[in-house]
C-alpha cells in the first residue's frame, strides 16, 4: 500500500516517509462501532470518550438487546441529546429484532454498505464512511465529508481550498488504497508535519 501510494503521489509519498508507519485502530464489533460513531458526531473527542465510557458502564454488555431495553431518558442522561439517544435506540431495536443485519454488511460492496448504513436515522455519509474504515476495514475510503481530510489535502498540496473535482482526482490517484492515504492526511491535518501548517 505504502509503496504504491509513494509511486502514485510524490508529495504524499514524501509525507508518508517523514511521518512513518501509522496504526489504524479498528473496532470489529459493528454494533458498538455504529453507536460509537453516532455518539461522536459533531462533538469533541473528549466528549465522545466520556459519553462512550458512561454508556459502557450503564449498559454493562454492549449488545443490541441491552441497549434496546434502555429508556431514552437513561441514554440522554449519559450526556447525549434526546435526538441522538432516539437514533441509538432505534438502531439497537432494529439490530436486536434482525431488521438490520449487521453481519450481512461484511459481504456487501462499499456502495451497498453505504446505502444500507445511511438508511438508518442518525447515520449520514460521513458516519457510514468512518464505519467502512474503522469497523469493516475497507481499503479504499477517502471521505469528501471529512474536514480533516480536506485540510490535510490543502496543507499537503498547498491549496487554498479543495473542490469536488480536485478531491475526486486525488481520490482516484490514491485508489485502491484510499484508506491508507486518509490516515496520512489526518495525521498531516493534525500537525504531524509542522512545516505544512
Can you annotate each of these PLM segments?
Residues 11, 43-121, 173:
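Alpha-helical ds-nucleic-acid-binding substructure associated with the helix-hairpin-helix region
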Residues 33-38, 54, 70-74, 112-116, ...:
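A general alpha-helix detector
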Amino acid at each position: 500500500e505504502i509503496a504504491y501510494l509513494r509511486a502514485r503521489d510524490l508529495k504524499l509519498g514524501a509525507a508518508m516517509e517523514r511521518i512513518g508507519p501509522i496504526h489504524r485502530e479498528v473496532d470489529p464489533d459493528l454494533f458498538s462501532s455504529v453507536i460509537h460513531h453516532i455518539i461522536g458526531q459533531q462533538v469533541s473527542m473528549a466528549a465522545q470518550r466520556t459519553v462512550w465510557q458512561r454508556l459502557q458502564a450503564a449498559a454493562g454488555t454492549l449488545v443490541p438487546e441491552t441497549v434496546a431495553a434502555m429508556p431514552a431518558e437513561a441514554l440522554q442522561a449519559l450526556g447525549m441529546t434526546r435526538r441522538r439517544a432516539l437514533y441509538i435506540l432505534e438502531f439497537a431495536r432494529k439490530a436486536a429484532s434482525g431488521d438490520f443485519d449487521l453481519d450481512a454488511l461484511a459481504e456487501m460492496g462499499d456502495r451497498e454498505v453505504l446505502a444500507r448504513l445511511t438508511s438508518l436515522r442518525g447515520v449520514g455519509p460521513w458516519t457510514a464512511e468512518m464505519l467502512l474504515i474503522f469497523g469493516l476495514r475497507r481499503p479504499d475510503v477517502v471521505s469528501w465529508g471529512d474536514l480533516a481530510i480536506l485540510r490535510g489535502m490543502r496543507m499537503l498540496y498547498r491549496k487554498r481550498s479543495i473542490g469536488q473535482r480536485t478531491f475526486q482526482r486525488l481520490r482516484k490517484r490514491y485508489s485502491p488504497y484510499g484508506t491508507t492515504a486518509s490516515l496520512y492526511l489526518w495525521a498531516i491535518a493534525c500537525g504531524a508535519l509542522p512545516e505544512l501548517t
